[in-house]
Amino acid sequence: RLLELFELDELEDRDNVTMREDELEEVLKGMLDYAYEKGILKENSVVYRDLFDTKIMGLLMPRPSEVIRHFHELYEQVSPEAATDYYYKLSRDSDYIRRYRICKDMKWVAPTKYGDLDITINLSKPEKDPKAIAAAKLAKQSGYPKCLLCRENEGYAGRVNHPARQNHRIIPVTINGSQWGFQYSPYVYYNEHCIVFNSQHVPMKIEHATFCKLFDFVKQFPH
């Protein structure tokens, strides 16, 4: 499938291939540069490169059903923490969480009279270039996915005004008798920053059931 993506019929010079371990960022950079040189990647800006490298990683990802099955196997046979550790590592190794950008974030603790205050400045979200901004303005408005969090994002190819998510996997969970989705945030405002979202698009509100759901989630994932 990678050959198809890069419009190749076969591997060239297979006998002289050497194996080495490089950081994922460098590997993807080389692939993106090649794609641009060959005219496969039409624009060499961060928005279009992000769309394309997510497509690359999506080809290497296990199917959603495989991820869910392995998560539940670890949860039941080992521990809830083992399950979330596996899922978090997958989210990082798949480049869904871009570690090389997250490390640019600024974080510090400021003492106040009310106690220590954790402060984070997120620098990992890429800035859109002028061409991408212009393309986003001209792009047909779409209501799909309905938001940046809903389950329809899983596997979505993305566009100039919506991030690609082919490398994204969601874990279904039942909370307080209703269906929810568990995922990690790609921007990691704090360690293992996770998100739990309703399977249905309903208004967000704080009520008695909200606290029942919170306690049910903590009961399932006590670590």
List the predicted regions and their residue ranges.
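Long, well-ordered alpha-helical scaffolding segments within enzyme catalytic domains
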Residues: 206-222
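Active-site microenvironments that recognize anionic phosphate/pyrophosphate groups
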Residues: 1-206
